[in-house]
Amino acid sequence: MIEPISTNDAPGAVGPYSQAIKVGDLLFVSGQLPIDPATGEFNSANAVEQAEQCLKNLQAIARAAGTDLSKTVKTTVLLTDLGDFADINRVYTGFFSTPYPARACYEVKALPKGAKVEIEAVISLT
């Protein structure tokens, strides 16, 4: 069964998609932009602070589904400047510990709303 997951503790979708979808024992979390759910705005123009907000948003959605980031199986990180990679890794280790989730990281030309970072995740519910 497919179950949408939604929380006001993370920003609403900026397009026709769900914050997350629960299928079986997995939670597929849509890419999170660095939007502060309280204001609906970017928290910062700084890539490091944007990454932190993206991960806070992922954390809020995981909690809404009854899980947490420690059960993350895979993430995909999108950056508009791969030069931010090392700094983003430092933020990342504040939210994840070993064994780290599988991950892909790509440099992209642009992200929605002019963001510098977007992060999506697949999280176990067991």
Curated annotation (Swiss-Prot):
Disulfide bond entries: none
Matches recorded under Pfam families: Ribonuc_L-PSP
InterPro entries (alphabetical): RidA, RidA_CS, RutC-like_sf, YjgF/YER057c/UK114
UniProt-listed CDD domains: YjgF_YER057c_UK114_family
UniProt keywords, alphabetically: Plasmid
Alphabetical list of PROSITE patterns matching this protein: UPF0076
Keyword Protein transport: no
Recorded GO CC terms: cytosol
Top-level division of the source organism's lineage: Bacteria
Single GO term (MF): deaminase activity
Family membership noted in the UniProt record: Belongs to the RutC family.
Official protein name in the record: RutC family protein y4sK
